Amino acid sequence: MNKIILITDQPPLDNASFCPFELGTIDECVEYISKQEVVGVDTETEGKDFTRNKIVMFQIGTADIQYVIDTRTISIEPLRAYLEGSAIKIFHNVKFDYKFIKSNYNIEVNNIYDTMLAECILHCGKDKWGYSLNHLTQRYLEISLNKEIRNKFIGLEGKPFTSEQICYGAQDIQYLLKIMDIQLKEIQQLGLSSLLLLETKTSLAFADIEYNGLCFDKESWLTNADINEGMVHKLEKELDEEITTNKLVEFMPNYLQLDMFTPVEELRKVNVKWSSPIQVKKVMNSYLQINLDKVNAFELYKYKDKPLVTRYLQYKEKQKISSTYGKSFLKYVMKDGKVR
C-alpha cells in the first residue's frame, strides 16, 4: 500500500482527507532512503530562476513510500551523502532540479537517470510526441497527473502546504521507478544503453555550464554597443548619400519636415528605412534596374561591386550585431551578473 510522509515544522493547511499522509522526521527519511538502491527525486520551487528562487518542497522515495519535505523549515543536508553517493536517483528533466539543488544546498547529485531524456532518446526527440511526466504516466501507466497544482507553489512564502500540494509532490516521484523499468527494457533491446549514458553525462555537463554561467563585463559591453550603434548611424548616412548621389528621386521627399531643434543640414533628405527589407528591395530594384525577390546577402553579393550594395551589406552586418548583441542583450544578464 502506498504511503506519503510529510516532513515539516508546521502543520498542513487542511486535513488529509484529500490525500492521506503521515507526519515524519528527516532522520526517519534518511534511515529508509539509505537502504534503497533506486529512488525517485523531484523538487518544487518558487520559480524557474535558480539564482533568485528557492526550493520549497523536496520529494524523495520509492513506488511504495514517498517523503515530501518542506524545505522552508527542514534542510535536506542529512541526505547529502546519499544524493552524492552511488545509488540511482531518478529525475524527470534533471537539468532543472540539479541546478536548484546545487544552488540551494551545494549538493552535486550523482548517478542519475532522467526519464525525460530517456524518452527523447527512444523517440528521437520527435515534435509533438510528448515528453512531460504526465505524457509518460499516461503512455506507460494509463495514469493522468494534475499538473495545474505546480503553479500553486509560486508565491507560497510561509503558508503551509495543502493536502492537494502534498499529494501532487508525492505523485511526481511515485511513478518514476516503474517508468524507468519500462524504458530500460526498450533501451536495452534497441542497443541504446551507451547513448543514454553519454546523453546523461552531457546533460549534467550542460547543467554545470548553466549553473556557473558566463562572466559578463557590462561596462565594456555597453561601450562596444555604443561604438556599433555609431557605425550603424554612419552607414545609414552613407546609404542616404548614395541615394542623393545617384539621384534616385523617388526616394527623396519633395519637402523636409522641419522642427525647432534639428538644423536643416542635419535633416534626412531620404525617406528610406534601411532596416526594412521591403523598402530596401524597392531601392535596389531601382538602383540596379532589375527585379530582385529578396535582398539578403546571398542575392546581393553578386552585385557587391556597386557602391550602394557594398554599403548596404556593411550596414546589415553592423545592424545585426547592434540589434542582437547590443544594449538589448542585457536582458540575458542574471541577478549574479552572469549570462546563462
Residue ranges and their predicted role:
Residues 24-27, 43-44, 74-78, 190:
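Short alpha-helical segments and helix-capping/turn motifs at coil-helix boundaries
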Residues 23-37, 80-83:
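A short acidic-Thr-Gly-centered motif at the start of a beta-strand
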Residues 2-20, 49, 53-188, 196-198, ...:
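Active-site-proximal helix-loop-helix substrate-binding element of RNase H-like nuclease domains
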Residues 38-51:
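Short acidic, Gly/Ser-rich segments with clustered Asp/Glu that frequently serve as metal-coordination loops
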Residues 33-36, 86, 105, 125, ...:
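Alpha-helix boundary/capping residues
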Residues 1-21, 179-340:
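Conserved "right-hand" nucleotidyltransferase catalytic core of DNA-directed polymerases
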